[in-house]
Amino acid sequence: MSSSSGKVGFVSLGCPKNTVDSERILTQLRTEGYEISASYEDADVVLVNTCGFIDSAVQESLDAIGEALRENGKVIVTGCLGAKEDVIREVHPKVLAVSGPHAYTEVMNQVHQVAPKPEYNPFVNLVPDTGVKLTPKHYAYLKISEGCNHRCTFCIIPSFRGDLVSRPIGDVLGEAQRLVKNGVKELLVISQDTSAYGVDTKYRTGFWEGRPVKTRMKELCDELGRMGVWVRLHYVYPYPHVDDVIPLMADGKILPYLDIPFQHASPSVLKNMRRPAHAEKVLHRIGKWREQCPDITLRSTFIVGFPGETEEDFQTLLNFLEEAQLDRVGCFKYSPVEGATANELPDPVEEVVKQERWERFMEVQQRISASRLQAKIGKRMDVIVDEVVEEGAVCRSKADAPEIDGQVFLDNQTHLKPGDLVTVEIEDADEYDLWGRPV
């Protein structure tokens, strides 16, 4: 390998927040003239952006580092697992350097030591003003803040990413505008805690296009809603002021979609998680949201088998599912994470019980999901095309986020292109997906 070639291999793991970090590093690499290598053997060095949220993610990251070391030998590690350098070096002592998440300057300095900066080339350095994106051209993640002020007992992300730091609202809206001008049809708003946006700045007033705008979720949504694209909210903590964005959904300014992790419904379990413990209030709010915005899609995630969870607690959760009738739900079996305070809680749940509860949970939610999707047969809706395959077009409705939700299949519609917006009539459904035809 030539040390003057300026080629960098890149492996990106983890959540959409990590994807955005990877995009920023890749953008800086391309801006400085580095080539991004598609293979290990052609790269001067390999960057691995890791995840460290749960044990399986840690193992995946360690495996990826090991593969890069075997195939190339020169590896720089960054990302959430990088905050635990001792864990990485215990398994892979030969990595060149380790840094934590969003350590962009440190990562670039490490790259410079291994692969010298290429000579400036105005053609190589023509990077789009949106930067390098790892998503398809028609949608993009818009990260509005870093870190989190909550200390949920099952989560160690604040130890990686620190407390909440909100981006200036003018910077966020400027990035959104550039993305839209370059053809993005859907903005996926992400952070560790989207509804806390601006709390750390005391909702400081920023400026956008000469107008004062508060650094706050409602005002952000209001401005994004003027850009003429789909706007989807992710990772929304159930603060009371979440209610303020529902009218924007009802008015069509942003998508009627709320990704709001409730985690459980039992007051005792929620207390042990250090989460809001008012299931009855949550059900009341869900009812109000649906009154204001009948088309709203509610996505949530839950944990079963948390330490101390009794059969009665679990039944409370199942009852909540039946009453809430959520559209999209993810469920995880509790897994101890090194450094999480939940590890100190008494009465751990046996693995066989966790599995049994997870299966019961999924059986209930699968039935709910199937029922809610069956109700869409015969209705018309707008979908966005994600890809076109031999059988037809694979799309998503306003109720479906990329990768985590369902899809809408349009058989034989091979003339469509990714990013096309199409009005369809739904003809069939199963537990998670829909089938339709253009109208």
Curated annotation (Swiss-Prot):
It comes from the Bacteria. Binds 2 [4Fe-4S] clusters. One cluster is coordinated with 3 cysteines and an exchangeable S-adenosyl-L-methionine. One of its GO terms (biological process) is tRNA modification. SUPFAM superfamilies: Radical SAM enzymes. Its main location: cytoplasm. It comes from Hahella chejuensis (strain KCTC 2396). [4Fe-4S] cluster 2 binds at residues 148, 152, 155. PROSITE patterns: MTTASE_N, MTTASE_RADICAL, RADICAL_SAM, TRAM. Its cofactor is [4Fe-4S] cluster. One of its GO terms (cellular component) is cytosol. Residues 374-439 form the TRAM domain. [4Fe-4S] cluster 1 binds at residues 15, 51, 80. It catalyses: L-aspartate(89)-[ribosomal protein uS12]-hydrogen + (sulfur carrier)-SH + AH2 + 2 S-adenosyl-L-methionine = 3-methylsulfanyl-L-aspartate(89)-[ribosomal protein uS12]-hydrogen + (sulfur carrier)-H + 5'-deoxyadenosine + L-methionine + A + S-adenosyl-L-homocysteine + 2 H(+). PANTHER family: RIBOSOMAL PROTEIN S12 METHYLTHIOTRANSFERASE RIMO, RIBOSOMAL PROTEIN US12 METHYLTHIOTRANSFERASE RIMO. Keywords: 4Fe-4S, Cytoplasm, Iron, Iron-sulfur, Metal-binding, S-adenosyl-L-methionine, Transferase. CDD domains: Radical_SAM. This is Ribosomal protein uS12 methylthiotransferase RimO. Residues 134-371 form the Radical SAM core domain. Belongs to the methylthiotransferase family. RimO subfamily. SMART domains: Elp3 (SM00729). Catalyzes the methylthiolation of an aspartic acid residue of ribosomal protein uS12. Its EC number is 2.8.4.4. One of its GO terms (molecular function) is 4 iron, 4 sulfur cluster binding. It is found in: Cytoplasm. Residues 6-116 form the MTTase N-terminal domain.
